[in-house]
Amino acid sequence: MKKSHTAMTTLKHYLQFTDLTADEYTYLFERAALIKKKFKAYEKHHPLVDRTLAMIFEKASTRTRVSFEAGMYQLGGSVVHLTTGDSQLGRAEPIEDSAKVISRMTDLVMIRTYEQAKIERFAANSRVPVINGLTNEYHPCQILADIFTFIEHRGSIQGKTVAWVGDGNNMANTWLQAASLLGFKVHVSTPRGYEVDEKLAAGAGGISADSYQFFSNPLEACRGADLVTTDVWTSMGYEAENEERRVAFADWCVDAEMMAAAQPDALFMHCLPAHRGEEVEADVIDGPQSVVWDEAENRMHVQKALMEYLLLGRIA
């Protein structure tokens, strides 16, 4: 029986987590599970034949590049890869002009850059969907993968508690958006001076008061959590603060005591790359509660579902 799909009638971008609805996420998670199952069974799945993804990197990446590039090829499409060395994004050419040109030659654009404002400007002038591969403010594709990984291992995340330990960065911002949208709670613990910017985290969709709680003690943030997650102490672009951050974050290392305070079946996640002995101890990230390798692989599967959806809509 031939499959049918409902093509997008309006252009849709994925620039932050609030760009999709809870219903759309339910569809994406179900679709990602099916696409992953096909991948594991070596079944071809080529809905994007003759489609081209442009990837623009102003921030270097391993997982983002491999997951998007391999994913697009697995969907039957092709990829154009641009870096700061071979693109003129926002330098010799205005971002608006680059967007108008690139979107006439490709079907989909993924951008990994510094300022959220830059990707917003690009999307406003693009004729094709634009995906946020990471900005200083948000990392929606990673949280998409993290939630999918939780669902794979523990079922629905609705009503659960996620403990965020560390920097109040783009990951923390996006977790807050996701919690408000999908109905779970986030316990956030950061050192003083590195708190989550609540106004930034609110973005377009806002955060609800009952989805967020701040803890000055990271151990208390982990108490009763169903998922404990963290990130590097020093994100890309903040290298000059590295030594200062090592001192400030010394007590924000996820260890066995924090995991013991969480639920007995709590999971540990990290978006990688990880620095063992800094934001997480080796016995945690390499231990039985860690699902970081599934989490990393799932970036590819959820992004395949996302690209398929942005171009083809829902497939029956």
Label the predicted regions.
Residues A204-D283:
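Rossmann-like adenosine-cofactor binding region
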Residues L48-L53, Q158-K160, D265:
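Phosphate-coordination loops involved in phosphoryl transfer and adenosine-cofactor binding
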Residues D265-A266, C271-A316:
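Adenosine-phosphate binding glycine-rich loop
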Residues E58-A70, E152-T230:
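Glycine-rich phosphate/diphosphate-binding loop of Rossmann-like nucleotide-binding domains
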Residues Y42, H46-I151, R276:
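Phosphate/diphosphate ligand-binding glycine-rich loop within oxidoreductases
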Residues M1-V66, A70:
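Positively charged, low-complexity intrinsically disordered leader regions
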Residues L75, M105, N125-S126, L182, ...:
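Short, structured coil segments at secondary-structure junctions
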